[in-house]
């Protein structure tokens, strides 16, 4: 891969990371709201939009190859991409439900695989990607 492609891939990852981070922050807030329904007296929630954005952003980086940034990273890269696929399936499953409650999202937020992907993304950004 050329240096220009490396920079483009880093930009793609960082753009996705920004969307993922915003979506995850919304999930944390929603999980703490105690909603039994997506719509309440304040109007409809944006939970489905947030889940879609999260899943779409993960899809955009589902084929990244970190070996362009570091040697001996293949095991980490494989594990990260496997976890990413699991998180995508969780988000898709939630979107298929007729109602998404705060408790469902709170439990989703607590899943180790969700935290693993989030932490791995921050690690990738700080350690492997070219400096901003």
Regions found by a protein language model. Give the residues of each.
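Short terminal alpha-helical segments
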Residues: 2-48, 120
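Short, well-structured hydrophobic secondary-structure segments
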Residues: 36-67
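Amphipathic alpha-helical binding modules
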Residues: 87-132
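Short, well-ordered alpha-helical segments
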Residues: 79-89
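Short, flexible helix-adjacent loops and helix caps
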Residues: 29-39, 66-69, 96-103, 126
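Short, solvent-exposed, charged loop/turn and helix-capping segments
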Residues: 56-78, 97, 101
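Short, well-structured alpha-helical interface segments that form or flank functional binding sites
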Residues: 8-11, 15-22, 49, 56, ...
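Short, charged, amphipathic alpha-helical segments
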Residues: 39-45, 78, 104-112
């Amino acid at each position: 891969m050329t240096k220009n492609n490396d920079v483009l891939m880093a930009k793609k990852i960082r753009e996705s990371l920004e969307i993922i981070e915003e979506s995850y922050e919304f999930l944390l807030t929603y999980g703490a709201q105690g909603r039994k329904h997506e719509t309440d007296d304040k109007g409809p929630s944006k939970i489905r939009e947030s889940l879609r954005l999260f899943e779409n952003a993960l899809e955009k980086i589902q084929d990244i190859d970190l070996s362009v940034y570091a040697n001996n990273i293949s095991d980490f890269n494989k594990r990260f991409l496997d976890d990413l696929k699991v998180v995508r399936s969780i988000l898709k499953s939630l979107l298929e439900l007729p109602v998404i409650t705060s408790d469902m999202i709170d439990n989703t937020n607590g899943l180790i695989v969700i935290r693993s992907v989030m932490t791995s993304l921050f690690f990738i950004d700080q350690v492997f990607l070219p400096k901003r």
